[in-house]
C-alpha cells in the first residue's frame, strides 16, 4: 500500500516499524460542542484506513485523543454554568453517539489530556533540561522554536517566512515571537495542576505529544488529522517531541482536505456549520459516510443536500444488491457459477488496487458499485451454494472495509414499525384491504417499504 506522506510530499510504500503491526495516532476533537461535518471527515477517513489495514491482516493500534482542557472548554463551561470536566464528559458522550452513527469503530484507546498531566509535566521538564524550553515569571513555559533546527519541515515554512508575520502579544513574556506555550500559568477560576514552575495547565500542542508517545512510543507509524492541523499543531508536535527524544516522531503524516458547504468555506461567520447531529435528523449517517468517501481524502469536498441525497440513493442500491444476494435461490452448480466465482478475484483486485493507491475510496466505491451490478445480474437465476457464499463474502469484505451496511447488521426495525407490520397482517387476514393499504402508506412515511411474499410480509428500508 502506498500513502501520501505530507512530510516528504510524495506517495510512499507503507512499511511499518514492526512487521504485521501498525501504530496510528489521529488528532481527535476538542470536546466543547457537538461535532460538525468537517470533524466527521477525518473520523470517517482514518477509520476506513484502519479497517482496510486490518482487512490486509495488520494488527492496528489506533489512538485518537480527546482534548478536554483548553481555552474553548473553559469559555463554554462558563457560558453553560458548568464545570470543565462535566462539559467534557457531556460532549465526549455526544461524540461517541455521532461516531457510532457514522459507523466508526471504537479506537484502541481515547486518551484524555487531563488523564496524562504527569506525562505532560515530565515532557516539559525534559525540554527545559535540554535547553529547548524556558519558564517565565507568570508561570508560563515556552518552547524555543529556534532551538530546533528542523522547525518548518512538515509545513514547508521557513523561520524567515514565519518571522515576518510574528509578533509578541501584550502580556506575553516569551523571548521570541515564534515561541509557543507548552504550559500556561494558572489564572483565577481556571482548572490548574501543580508543577515544578507553579500551578497551571498544559498547552494544546504538548498534550498530543505526551499522549502519543506514552501510548505508542517515541516513534510510531502514522500520525493523521485534518489539513488545518499541519501548521501550527503538527509542526509544533514534531518540534517538541523530537527535541525531547532525539528520535524521529511519526514516520508517515496523513492529512484530509477541507469540507465546503454549498461551495463556501464552512465558518461561524457565514453560519453554515452543519452539525452531524442535525444531519442525522434528515439522512441516514451511513449515507453521509458514503458521501465522505466519495472523493479522494486529500481533495476538498463540497457538502450539499443534493450530493447527500445522491449518496443515499447509492447506499440503497448497494443495500438492495446485498439483500437480493441473501435471498437468492440455491440451485445446482453450472458453468456460469464457475465463471462468476472466477471473476471474484478481479473484482477484489480492482477494489484493493484503489485502496492501495493512497486510500482512493472514490475508485474503491466505483469497484463496489460495479460488483453490486454484477451480483444483481447473477442472482436472477438459482445459483450454487458455493457461488452464493463466496459472492457474499466478497460483498461483506468490501462493505466492512468501507464501513457501510453496518447498521443493518445490528439494528432492529423500530418497535412502532414492527407493530404496524403485524397490524397490517391482521388487517389482510380480515380482508380489511383499506386499512392494510393505509398502514403501507404510514410505513412509507416512516421510511420503510413492505415486501409481500409467500413467506409473509417484511420491512425494507427505503
PLM features per residue range, with description:
Residues 66-70, 92-95, 105-120, 138-146:
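Short, glycine/charge-rich beta-strand/loop segments that flank catalytic centers
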Residues 1-32, 47, 97, 118-326:
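Alpha-helical recognition segments enriched in aromatics with Gly/Pro capping
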Residues 8-13, 17-105, 455-459:
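N-terminal, positively charged nucleic-acid-binding surface of large information/translation enzymes
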Residues 78-84, 108-114, 226:
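The substrate-binding groove and active-site-proximal loops of carbohydrate-active enzymes
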Residues 265-266, 272-462:
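Structural preference for alpha-helix termini/caps and helix-kink/transition segments
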Residues 58, 132, 448:
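Short phosphate-binding/catalytic loops that engage adenosine nucleotides
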Amino acid at each position: 500500500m502506498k500513502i501520501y506522506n505530507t512530510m516528504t510530499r510524495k506517495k510512499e510504500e507503507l512499511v511499518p516499524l514492526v512487521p504485521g503491526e501498525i501504530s496510528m495516532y489521529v488528532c481527535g476533537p476538542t470536546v466543547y460542542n457537538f461535532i460538525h461535518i468537517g470533524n466527521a471527515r477525518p473520523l470517517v477517513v482514518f477509520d476506513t484506513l484502519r479497517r482496510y489495514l486490518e482487512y490486509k491482516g495488520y494488527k492496528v493500534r489506533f489512538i485518537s485523543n480527546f482534548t478536554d482542557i483548553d481555552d474553548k472548554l473553559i469559555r463554554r463551561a462558563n457560558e453553560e454554568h458548568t464545570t470543565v470536566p462535566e462539559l467534557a464528559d457531556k460532549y465526549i458522550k455526544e461524540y461517541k453517539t455521532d461516531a457510532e452513527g457514522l459507523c466508526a469503530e471504537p479506537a484502541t484507546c481515547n486518551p484524555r489530556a487531563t488523564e496524562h498531566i504527569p506525562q505532560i509535566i515530565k515532557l516539559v521538564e525534559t525540554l527545559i533540561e535540554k535547553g529547548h524550553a524556558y519558564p517565565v515569571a507568570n508561570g508560563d513555559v515556552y518552547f524555543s522554536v529556534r532551538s530546533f533546527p528542523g522547525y518548518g519541515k512538515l509545513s514547508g515554512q521557513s523561520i524567515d517566512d514565519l518571522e515576518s508575520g510574528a509578533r509578541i502579544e501584550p502580556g506575553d513574556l516569551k523571548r521570541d515571537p515564534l515561541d509557543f506555550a507548552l504550559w500556561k500559568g494558572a489564572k483565577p477560576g481556571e482548572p490548574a495542576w501543580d508543577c515544578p514552575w507553579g500551578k497551571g495547565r498544559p498547552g494544546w500542542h504538548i498534550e498530543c505529544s505526551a499522549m502519543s508517545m506514552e501510548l505508542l512510543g517515541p516513534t510510531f507509524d502514522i500520525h493523521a488529522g485534518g489539513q488545518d492541523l499541519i501548521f501550527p499543531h503538527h509542526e509544533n508536535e514534531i518540534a517538541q517531541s523530537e527535541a525531547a527524544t532525539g528520535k524521529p516522531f511519526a514516520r508517515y503524516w496523513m492529512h484530509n482536505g477541507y469540507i465546503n458547504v454549498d461551495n463556501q468555506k464552512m465558518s461561524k461567520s457565514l453560519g453554515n456549520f452543519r452539525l452531524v447531529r442535525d444531519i442525522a435528523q434528515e439522512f441516514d449517517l451511513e449515507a453521509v459516510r458514503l458521501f465522505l468517501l466519495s472523493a479522494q481524502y486529500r481533495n476538498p469536498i463540497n457538502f450539499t443536500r443534493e450530493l447527500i441525497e445522491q449518496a443515499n440513493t447509492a447506499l440503497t442500491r448497494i443495500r438492495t444488491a446485498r439483500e437480493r444476494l441473501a435471498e437468492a435461490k440455491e440451485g445446482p452448480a453450472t458453468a456460469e457459477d464457475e465463471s462468476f466465482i472466477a471473476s471474484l478475484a478481479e473484482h477484489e483486485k480492482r477494489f484493493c488496487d484503489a485502496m492501495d493507491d493512497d486510500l482512493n475510496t472514490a475508485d474503491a466505491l466505483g469497484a463496489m458499485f460495479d460488483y453490486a451490478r454484477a451480483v444483481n445480474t447473477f442472482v436472477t437465476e438459482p445459483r450454487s451454494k458455493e457461488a452464493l457464499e463466496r459472492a457474499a463474502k466478497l460483498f461483506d469484505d468490501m462493505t466492512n472495509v468501507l464501513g457501510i451496511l453496518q447498521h443493518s447488521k445490528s439494528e432492529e426495525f423500530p418497535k412502532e414499525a414492527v407493530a404496524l407490520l403485524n397490524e397490517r397482517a391482521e388487517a389482510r387476514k380480515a380482508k380489511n384491504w383499506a386499512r392494510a393499504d393505509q398502514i403501507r402508506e404510514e410505513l412509507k412515511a416512516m421510511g420503510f417499504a413492505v415486501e409481500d411474499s409467500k413467506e409473509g410480509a417484511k420491512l425494507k428500508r427505503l
